[in-house]
UniProtKB/Swiss-Prot annotation:
Belongs to the ParA family. SUPFAM superfamilies: P-loop containing nucleoside triphosphate hydrolases (SSF52540). Gene3D superfamilies: P-loop containing nucleotide triphosphate hydrolases. Coiled coil: none annotated. It comes from Mycoplasma genitalium (strain ATCC 33530 / DSM 19775 / NCTC 10195 / G37) (Mycoplasmoides genitalium). CDD domains: ParAB_family (cd02042). InterPro entries: AAA_dom, DNA_Partitioning_ATPase, P-loop_NTPase. This is ParA family protein MG470. Pfam families: AAA_31.
Amino acid sequence: MIISFVNNKGGVLKTTMATNVAGSLVKLCPERRKVILDLDGQGNVSASFGQNPERLNNTLIDILLKVPKFSGSNNFIEIDDCLLSVYEGLDILPCNFELNFADIDISRKKYKASDIAEIVKQLAKRYEFVLLDTPPNMATLVSTAMSLSDVIVIPFEPDQYSMLGLMRIVETIDTFKEKNTNLKTILVPTKVNVRTRLHNEVIDLAKTKAKKNNVAFSKNFVSLTSKSSAAVGYEKLPISLVSSPSKKYLNEYLEITKEILNLANYNVH
């Protein structure tokens, strides 16, 4: 199953959602292999597991640019050279700052969007779950991820600016559904403070819009908290994988993950 996390707005917890859904899958499906492919040049997926993306020897860009394994070699860096095992049953394929120039690189024919797609397809042959963390835009990397996905998760912060962007993403996804009729989409509110009137109003409006557009809307949400960043800072793990997680926040991600699996008609047992 390929799951993309998409929003053209930054700061909505895309990476936090991707890494914690991955952590939840570790607990819900311990026998199944999972991998997160980082398509966001900020490299926050590897940072979420205590890695500095700028100090990693091999990353996604090295595969795309066909970098030799060593000087003078005719053998190029491959997927296996880049994978990092970050938890039992969970790997990541990291990226770094250079991936921010993907559209420029593609326009200069350094590599093609189809090369990225091929990497995703290769991962899907080896892993039960492939999670794609995408950059905050709707450019080539994101469109490639969406075109390959079984489920697209759209985390959004329920503020006054979110609705227009959400509907534009939904409209874009509709074009992919023409070729992939089984594609599922789910909206998930993040940074929610239920005591804030604006948050409740925006969530209600988003639910209505989602229903009109035949898009699933999560029954659960991610609460506003600093505990996720604290987990990464102190334990170098997403909150869903730390040794003594807050039960409330762990359960939020577990329930959201169950919804994603149900949406894709995936039987956990």
